[in-house]
């Protein structure tokens, strides 16, 4: 039996590893239940408020088996603590393969420890680059990919990046975007939903296909208040009477509300709501007229759903969302935002499609490859 350790450093990681866990669970219930087993390890604590029970219920996976209990803001301290605690875990719980996902500091720490323990390392969402070495996450990506024995990529552009940086061809596998597995898995459950099923939206005058969704989380965007002021004005003015639903965390809400009061920004059509559950947010975005976001994951899901998406960033880790999909990059430029938003509201968006292998079977490919490799 092959023993896998699946490592998660933060809430979004669980969403990306959930399809893998579901595939393993199906195998354990099949004719050959002894092929593979797994343990799910989380860098944080058991009482982490971002890990609500509903998340795991929506994803149809169990809660982590192990919590390392690391809680600190300083990335260097966090890296050291994760390395120390994860090393002890691996020494006490031998594994054949450690699976990591994305580009967090905790992910890099787990990758380093895995290689020091001479355990095979598999990286999901490998080969993603911003080409901005001043970004901490870019450093993490370079380290994780450089250490990985198996690199699972979402697109051919990611393969090309990994190969150019020296990864052997035999180590790189284009399996598709694993986020899409969740959307396909959830389609039947979401199909019976309506906007009225979402408590946070009660009382809002919403109709499917006739509202916008706005998410904002990047610290750099929130910190530049002069530019944020301009972008909020453009957002509200250009949307006109179309409602804008903004499921935002407290830090973003505080910045936006303080700025609107200080600068007298009229946000008559912006409806700020609390963060939604996983399935609720999936339905909200799938039924939207368009999405304005700084999240790469949200943009990827929008591409699969064919929903117009404006990304408030000058780059994307998955360029397929721009070249093939429904995504448009406007950076932090208010006038580019105005132009793109005008097209979005008018319904004159570009033609778009779904990138190759974004078919909901990425996790199956991952597990098949891991089982076939010696």
Write out the residue ranges for each language-model feature:
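Nucleotide-activated sugar donor-binding and catalytic core shared by glycosyltransferases
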Residues: 1-244, 251-374
